[in-house]
From Swiss-Prot:
Part of the high-affinity ATP-driven potassium transport (or Kdp) system, which catalyzes the hydrolysis of ATP coupled with the electrogenic transport of potassium into the cytoplasm. This subunit binds the extracellular potassium ions and delivers the ions to the membrane domain of KdpB through an intramembrane tunnel. It comes from Bacillus cereus (strain ATCC 10987 / NRS 248). Keywords: Cell membrane, Ion transport, Membrane, Potassium, Potassium transport, Transmembrane, Transmembrane helix, Transport. GO terms for cellular component: plasma membrane. This is Potassium-transporting ATPase potassium-binding subunit. The keyword Coiled coil does not apply. It holds the Pfam family KdpA.
C-alpha cells in the first residue's frame, strides 16, 4: 500500500507540472483574463510605489534586484534586533544577538531559511509575520521574476522590468496559491491563530506549555516558495506543522510545483516545447535515482544494528516520525533537497551514510530541479555546457536556441560553475582548520566532516536544511554561513542574467542538417552526463572522505 501511495504522489508531481508551467507563461507574458483580474490591483501598486513599466537592461534589472533585496535585509535585521520592545510578543522574547540577526535576515532573503535559532523561543509573532513570512514571499518572488527575464533573454526578447515581474510573481502566483494552500492546511489540522501559549494538563497531572500561532499561513508559503524554515524548531516533524500523511503529501507537492513547472514555461516562451519536456524528463530520472538510492539505504537499516541481529523490518527508524514511516521520510528528504527547500520531516543527521549522501549530492548539484527560479538558471547553465562539450567533440561552433555560444558566455559560465564548489569547499576548509569551527562538531571522524560540509553546502545551495548535530549558533558560523548564503544566492543569478543578455543580442543561426538538436533523447542523455561529470565529480573527493568512508567503516 505504501508504494501505491508513493507512485500516486509521483504522478501528482508530473500531472500538475505542465498546467502550472502554462499558467506561469500566461501570468508573466500577458493574458487578457489574468490582466483583467490582477491588472487593477497591480496598477494601484505601481502608482503608489512610483514604478514605471519600461524595459530594463540586464544591469538595471540586476541592480534593482540587489538594491530591493538589500533594503529588505536591513529592515528585517532591525525587526529581529528590536523584537523585544515591539508589539505582538506575548512570550516576551528578547531581541536577537547581532550575528544571529545578520544570519537570519540574509538566510530568509536568500530563500535559504537556515535557522540557527529555534522558532518556539527565538522569534516573536511580529518577527514571524513581518520578518520571516514577508521574506518568504519576497525571496521566491525575486528569483521567479529573474528567471522570467532570463528566459526572455534566451528567447531574444527584451528582459522586462524587475519591479513589474516581482509584483506579478506576488499577486499572480504566490499570494493566491499560498492562500488556498493555507486553507487546506487549516482543514488538515494545522493551527492558525495569533493567540499566545496554551497551558495544558498532561495525563500524569503536570502542566505543559504549548505554543501555537499563525502556522498554516507560514507552512503554505514555506513550501510553495521553496523556503523551508520552520515555525517550530522541529520543522515539519512537528505535528502542528505537519499533522499527518495528507499534509505531508501536500507539502511535497507545493515544494515541487514551481521547479517542475519551469521547464514547461521555458519551452513555451522560447518556442521549443519539446526541449522543455526533455529537460523535465531528464531531471525527473535523476530525481528518481536519488529517491531509489536513499530509500534502499534507509530500508536496509543501520549496518551496526543489523550485525547485532536486531530486527529492522521498518528499516532505519532513527530520527524519523512513525506517522510518516521510512519510505515517505526518504521521499520527503529527496524532494526537499532536490527542490532546494530545506524543510525536513526527518532529522537528516540520523540518516544512514548513503541516505545522507543523496540530500548532500542534490544540494551540490543544485539543479535537480533546484529552487524557484534559481534552480532553473542552473539547469540552463548545465544545458549550455552540454551543448558546448558536444560542439567541441564534433568540431562545430556550439549553438543553443539558434545562438552561437562563444567565449564571453563560456567565461561567465565557467566562473559561475566554479564559484559554487569554491564557496562550499573553501569555507569548509576554513571551519575545519580553526577551533572556532571544529568546536561546533558533535561527531568525530567521517560524520563530523560531513556535518561541516553539509552546513556550507546547504548555505551555498540556498537550501537551509542541516545535520543538526552541529552547534552552529556562534558568531563564527553565523557570519560565515551568512556570507556563503549571500554570495551563493546573488553571484550566479547576476552572471547568468548577463549570459542571457549576451545571447539576446545575437542573431539566430539558420538550422542545418549538422545542427545539434537540443530537443531529443540524445541531448537528454548528454545533459544528464554533464550534470554527473561536471557537477558530481567536482565534489567526489569530499564525498569519499565523508559519507562513503563512513559507510565503509560501518559495513
Amino acid at each position: 500500500m505504501i508504494w501505491v501511495a508513493v507512485v500516486i504522489t509521483m504522478l501528482l508531481f508530473i500531472l500538475v507540472a505542465k498546467p502550472t508551467g502554462i499558467y506561469l507563461e500566461k501570468a508573466f507574458q500577458g493574458s487578457k483574463k489574468l490582466d483583467k483580474v490582477f491588472g487593477p490591483f497591480e496598477k494601484l501598486i505601481f502608482k503608489i510605489t512610483g514604478v514605471k513599466e519600461y524595459n530594463q537592461t540586464w544591469k538595471q534589472y540586476a541592480l534593482s534586484l540587489v538594491l530591493l533585496n538589500g533594503f529588505m535585509i536591513v529592515v528585517v535585521y532591525f525587526v529581529f534586533r528590536l523584537q523585544g520592545v515591539l508589539p505582538l510578543n506575548p512570550a516576551n522574547i528578547k531581541g536577537m544577538e547581532p550575528t544571529l540577526a545578520f544570519n537570519t535576515a540574509i538566510s530568509f532573503m536568500a530563500d535559504t531559511n537556515l535557522q540557527h535559532y529555534s522558532g518556539e523561543n527565538g522569534l516573536s509573532y511580529l518577527s514571524q509575520l513581518i520578518g520571516i513570512t514577508f521574506l518568504m514571499f519576497a525571496a521566491p518572488a525575486t528569483t521567479l521574476a529573474l528567471v522570467m527575464a532570463f528566459i526572455r533573454g534566451l528567447a531574444g526578447k527584451e528582459l522586462g522590468n524587475f519591479f513589474v515581474d516581482f509584483t506579478r510573481a506576488l499577486t499572480r502566483v504566490f499570494l493566491p496559491i499560498a492562500f488556498m494552500a493555507a486553507l487546506v492546511f487549516v482543514a488538515l489540522g494545522v493551527p492558525q491563530t495569533l493567540d499566545g501559549v496554551v497551558t495544558a494538563q498532561t495525563i500524569d497531572g503536570a502542566k505543559q506549555s504549548i505554543l501555537r500561532g499563525p502556522v498554516a499561513s507560514f507552512v503554505s508559503i514555506k513550501e510553495l516558495g521553496n523556503n523551508g524554515g520552520g515555525f517550530f524548531g522541529a520543522n515539519s516533524t512537528h505535528p502542528f506543522e505537519n499533522p499527518g500523511q495528507m499534509s505531508n503529501i501536500l507539502q511535497m507537492m507545493l515544494m515541487m510545483l514551481l521547479p517542475t513547472a519551469l521547464p514547461f514555461t521555458y519551452g513555451r516562451m522560447v518556442g521549443n516545447k519539446k526541449q522543455g519536456r526533455i529537460l523535465f524528463v531528464s531531471l525527473f530520472m535523476v530525481f528518481l535515482l536519488g529517491f531509489i538510492t536513499i530509500t534502499t539505504s534507509e530500508l536496509n537499516g543501520n549496518p551496526v544494528l543489523n550485525g547485532m541481529g536486531i530486527e529492522h523490518v521498518q528499516g532505519s527508524t532513527e530520527g524519523k516520525e512513525v506517522r510518516f514511516g521510512t519510505v515517505f521520510s526518504s521521499l520527503y528528504a529527496t524532494v526537499t533537497t532536490a527542490a532546494e527547500t530545506g524543510a525536513v520531516n526527518t532529522m537528516h543527521d540520523t540518516l544512514t551514510p548513503i541516505g545522507g549522501l543523496v540530500p548532500l549530492v542534490n544540494m551540490m548539484l543544485n539543479t535537480v530541479y533546484g529552487g524557484v527560479g534559481a534552480g532553473f538558471v542552473n539547469i540552463i547553465m548545465y544545458a549550455i555546457i552540454a551543448v558546448f562539450i558536444s560542439g567541441l567533440m564534433v568540431g562545430r561552433t556550439p549553438e543553443f536556441l539558434g545562438k552561437k555560444i562563444e567565449g564571453k558566455e563560456m567565461k561567465l559560465i565557467a566562473v559561475t560553475i566554479l564559484f559554487h564548489p569554491l564557496l562550499i569547499l573553501g569555507f569548509s576548509a576554513l571551519a575545519l582548520s580553526t577551533h572556532l569551527g571544529t568546536e561546533a562538531i558533535s561527531n568525530s571522524g567521517f560524520h563530523g566532516l560531513t556535518q561541516v560540509v553539509y552546513e556550507y553546502t546547504s548555505s551555498a545551495a540556498n537550501n537551509g536544511s542541516g545535520f543538526e548535530g552541529l552547534a552552529d549558533n556562534t558568531p563564527f558560523w553565523n557570519i560565515t554561513t551568512g556570507l556563503v548564503m549571500f554570495l551563493g544566492r546573488y553571484f550566479s543569478l547576476i552572471t547568468m542574467l548577463a549570459v542571457a543578455a549576451s545571447l539576446k543580442e545575437k542573431t539566430v543561426v539558420p538550422e542545418t542538417v549538422g545542427t545539434f538538436r537540443t530537443d531529443n533523447s540524445l541531448f537528454g542523455g548528454i545533459f544528464i552526463g554533464t550534470i554527473v561529470i561536471v557537477g558530481a565529480l567536482t565534489f567526489f573527493p569530499m564525498l569519499v572522505l565523508g559519507p562513503i568512508a563512513e559507510f565503509l567503516t560501518l559495513k
